[in-house]
Amino acid sequence: MSVDEPTRSAVVWCPDWPIVASSRVSDEPVAVMHANRVVASSARARADGVVRGLRRRESQQRCPSLVVLERDIEAEARAFEEVVGVLDDLTPRVEIVRPGLVVFPTRGPSRYFGGDRAMAQRCVELVQALLGPSGAVHVGVADAAFAATLASRRAGDERVHVVEAGASASFLAPFPIGALGRPELVGVLARLGLQTLGSFAALSPADVVARFGSEGEIAHRLARGLDERPPAVADPPPNMEVAEEIDPPIERVDQAAFVGKVLADQFLQRLHDRGATCTRIVVAAETEHGEELVRCWRHEGASVSYTHLRAH
């Protein structure tokens, strides 16, 4: 592998996960709201024009029979745990981007199943068997997680879209610049006439860094079909850890979650003090019987400020 060769990745995407997790009947017009805007809508609701980002009042005007639900992130995460558990049978390296979307490196699983497509189809079979008719699953495979994510959106009725190795940049090129998902940066790029990922990728990396800084550099790497950050070539910082001895032992999950949040805040502060960011977090829980459950969450917005991390 070359110094900056992207990681071959698979993304498993369960569309409309907030709707699926709500367990509402699939043929109902349903919208899940957060901050008074639609974050997910069922196929029936979309047919009436209820789409992501629409305000509550307008969505109800477009679809008077709309069933409105408030978003419950915790419930979505709990429901998605079953999907992650199924994928654990394929690989132990599943990273949760958010409930409804996971990514993992394909090297081991693809070799075991005889190729990227066979591996992706197996993912579809396992997850679809779990979800049944209430949900769908799409799998994208490409060089780098960003390209694999967009490939999962292109899977369509076949449920699988594989971008050949080395072809991620050309696959990404026609996508609109908005696919980067960074509104402020995208707005500037669009005003400069850069309407596609390909036009942005064609710029010199040095020019991008000089004009747009670190955020532009990350976005430029994504547009070029590379990983968000180049492989580390410097020594990692000294080991940092935070710990809390709990006596008597915790018996409730909410108590453990509270302690975990306090420790996470302390750790983030230490990272901030060193000018570092967090790109992944691994949470491990061990029971009194020695059973261990491990989950890895990927933080794709790790370039944002510490204050923003705390706020979200």
Regions found by a protein language model. Give the residues of each.
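Residues that scaffold, gate, or flank divalent-cation-dependent active/transport sites
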Residues: 1-110, 117-126, 145
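Short, hydrophobic beta-strand segments
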Residues: 101-108, 244-246, 294-297
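Conserved small/polar residues in nucleotide/adenosyl-binding loops
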Residues: 307-312
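Alpha-helical interaction/regulatory segments in DNA maintenance proteins
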Residues: 68-81, 204-249
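Compact, charge-rich alpha-helical regulatory domains located at protein termini
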Residues: 157-226
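C-terminal extensions
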Residues: 171-179, 226-286
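Structured, non-catalytic alpha/beta "coupling" segments that mediate domain-domain communication
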Residues: 119-160, 217-218, 222
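A residue-level signal for conserved active-site and pocket-lining positions in enzyme catalytic cores
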Residues: 59, 100, 139, 200, ...
